Amino acid sequence: MITGIISILCYLQCFGTLSASVTAKNENGNFVLKNKNVELVFANGKEFLFKEFRMDGMNILPVDGSTTHPWQLIYRGPNGENPTLMPRWGEYKGGEIQKTQDASTLIFTWQMVIDAGPTCPVRILVTLGKDAELPEWRIEAEMPEGWVITESEFPRIAVNRPEGAKGILPVGFGTEYTIGNEGQLQSRYPSCTGTMQLVLMHHKGGTVYFAAQDKGGSGKVFRMKSEGKSLVFIQNVTTSYAWTQNKKFCIPWETVMGFTQKGWQDAAVQWYRPFTFETLWGAKTISERPIAEWIKNADMWLRPGEVNAETMEAVRKAMKYYGKGVGLHWYYWHNHRFDTKYPEYFPEKAGFKEMIKETQELGGFITPYINGRLWDPATDSYKTLNGKDASCRKADGTLYTEVYSSKVLNTVTCPASYIWRDVLKGVNKQILTELKTNGVYMDQIGCANSEPCYATNHGHAPGGGDWWPFAYRSLLTEMRTNLYKENQAMTTEENAECYIDLFDMMLVVNSPHNSYTKMVPLFPLIYSDRCIYSGYTYIPWRITDGSLNFMSMRSLLWGSQLGWVEPSLLMRPDAKREAKFLKNLTDFRRQQHDLFLGGRFIQEIIPTGDNPTQEIPNYEITSVVLAAEWASVSGEHVYLIVNMSEQEHKVTLPNKKQITVKALDAIRISK
């Protein structure tokens, strides 16, 4: 117990003596933590109860308070004991107040029976700084020698769920979901289903914000679970064994919650965007990063899908039509079916070298596909290089094994394994030197989940934690230094934030789009000034039904590089309208680099006036003219307006200015 008190005091020493602008007191049977922005009320009784969370003029908790259990921990003992403990399995000891110069903290303690020795405390700490807009939540637990915490479910906070409330998750660009009376929404970070460490619930009365302030990028899952008229916000973490030191466990970051009567966009920009500038990945803008120059100028991408005469002829036509500077993301260049025989890409298909050279002479820049995460255990290399020792292992010693449409088993490799690091470096070197490409596209790194790994030979602590993104960080940095020349580019699939500064460009195509969801520009709001990204969603095989034109319009407005279309599909005679619109927008985008190379996306706009709607199959019903506000590198605020229809339209912008936009065209005007 003495050790626990000392640790709390050490944690709080960084703040100094209490300021009058933040108060923590015990009054009328309650603990009250309050500053000018926030007021939290907890019961001071025999049972823990979070009674009120007042912010921006509203109490966001249910009438009876947040009655869900505030934490749940899974322990692992030296004999294999594996209990799941929560408050009801312990003795609640009440709360106490710790005051310092710049902050106050409420500490709530439960004593838990772990073994025959003394009981072991679990504490939650709720801290509010004198000027803070968001209270910070932490958890710590003490335990006997030889024990660790393997899973944490904290915090768990139930808020009132108004009728019609919707959830915003950082899935792809950002996705809005309907919240039902039961079930849950979930976002796994870092991956395409959790590109950032926040989730939001919004309704006509305002927005609830829930986020982790983790500068390391550890794996975690955010959940929003419906319980009647309440919504429980939950953070699940598979822990690192390194987080248990000297018989004490703590999660090495704060979790925060807030409320604003403004919209979800305001909440994300006000609270999450500032945090990202404090991270390794978000500290530098595009103009401050060493990005390949051709990537900056690649306003459009093609996606050749084969190595044959028909594909090359389509590439020639497309390059002639769209001009120099186009990026080409080339698939199926190796002699095996897709998602098989990784990482054995060589020898390449006959004629690929010649196609690369010709395309480059036409002004194109090529990044061929490889996978940066999977190893097929049926390959010769897996056997000869002892691939099983590079594979990521579950706690029970088995391998993470994934199966895709190829129906072939693929094992997930651990990025900390030097076997796999050497393999990935070797493949990159061979592509760059033998094929002489302009870079390499490494699939899945920015998209697929980081997995907890319990292998004992990889040099990291067992479990989860930030070692996974840091392992990729050190590997990619080494490759950049030793293998890549100045104008050669690394690209990847999707936009998990912890890898932003490691890649020249990130392909964003995994956002869900159907009648149950709505794509929203959450990622551009936060990172449009620090990340170059391309794509919108996967390109459907039928592009003449309005879907490609809609995707091209949205891509431009959200700051994405355009296209990523199979050239033989794009250059068909029946796709002339789509090809022309894409060319118009590509030519337009080439003139807007003061926005897209260090400027910032501000908001999406639906102009009023003559602006009919069109149903886009498998997407949404959209106005045919959409717009966006951007801030340029110099600080100028402008509107971009795009008309995807074949008729001109006269529309009205938020500044009341009326503007006529020609058919299949885009314009820029100052705000």
Curated annotation (Swiss-Prot):
Keyword check for Zinc: no
Signal peptide: 1-24
Keyword list, A-Z: Glycosidase, Hydrolase, Signal
Pfam family, one: DUF6259
Domain of life assignment: Bacteria
EC number(s) on file: 3.2.1.-
Statement: the UniProt record of this protein carries the keyword Aminoacyl-tRNA synthetase: no
Enzyme class: hydrolase
InterPro entries attached to this UniProt entry: DUF6259
Sample GO molecular function, one term: hydrolase activity, acting on glycosyl bonds
Family to which this protein belongs: Belongs to the glycoside hydrolase-like 3 (GHL3) family.
Protein name listed in UniProt: Putative glycoside hydrolase BT_3595
Source organism of the structure: Bacteroides thetaiotaomicron (strain ATCC 29148 / DSM 2079 / JCM 5827 / CCUG 10774 / NCTC 10582 / VPI-5482 / E50)
